Amino acid sequence: MATKKTIITKDQIVSMYMNYVLEHSEKPKSVYHFTKINDFTETEFYAFFGTIESIEKEIFKMFVDKTIDLLNKNKEYELYDMKGKMLSFYFTFFEILTANRSYVVLVLKEHDNQLKKLMQLSGLRNSFRDYLSEIITDDFRTQQEKLQNFQEKAFLEASWIQLLLTLKFWL
């Protein structure tokens, strides 16, 4: 009788990846190597991820998604103002990071190149920006419009003063 193989999920792959990185202090050399030591196929891997780097991006995105899911489970969260929602987000997000601190510190301190860190956090950035778009209120937009009007007036006056100073220098 043949044994029935269980279907692997995206979350399981992410968990195996995080464990691998923590145990070896480096990312796997290849998809083949990673799938072989974790006893699943490359086809199963490629059903969710295109590269090893895409898992890294997905992990931080998943931290944001988990944060938002936890916040939305709280019935009172919908009643919070924008500031309250942001504070709740930060608190919950950093609690999730704390729960995964060893992994987060290892992968973010791995790169001296800031650009590589930014690339790794691109999924987090996109999810965070989407979250912000959802919680921005009309009051905030009105305040921003007032601020933009003020900035425009300040720019016009500063430019006028700059022209006067340049004229004075020219004389």
Q: Which residue stretches match the model-derived regions?
A:
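Short, amphipathic alpha-helix enriched in basic
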Residues: 2, 8-43, 47, 56-61
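An amphipathic alpha-helix adjacent to DNA-recognition modules
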Residues: 10-18, 46-72, 76, 83, ...
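Solvent-exposed, amphipathic alpha-helical segments
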Residues: 16-23, 66-70, 162-170
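Hydrophobic alpha-helical connector segments
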Residues: 58, 73-106, 113, 123, ...
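Amphipathic, well-packed alpha-helical segments that form the structural scaffold of globular domains
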Residues: 68, 72, 98, 108, ...
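Acidic/His metal-coordination segments adjacent to aromatic residues that form catalytic metal sites
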Residues: 79, 141-148
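Short linear capping/connector segments at secondary-structure termini
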Residues: 107-113, 145-148
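Amphipathic alpha-helical packing segments from all-alpha helical-bundle domains
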Residues: 117-143, 153-167
